[in-house]
Amino acid sequence: MPVWLQVDGKPVSCLEKIKVLNENLEEIRAMIADAVEDGVLMGCDPAQIRAVFHKLVEAAAADAPPAKREE
């Protein structure tokens, strides 16, 4: 699992936040693995599947609210 960083570059220290982030990451990983497997079984090009998912992540990141700094 990654070391989750705050906007200032310091590691997130709250264990509950880290737990939620890691759980979210694992859920997304499992969902992506299932979707890739489905696509491949249906005859889709794995490279195209990766490209589509990459664009999806880029779009989600672009739509994310700006990071807030702790005061």
Where are these regions (language model features)?
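Short acidic DE-rich linear segments
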Residues: 68-71
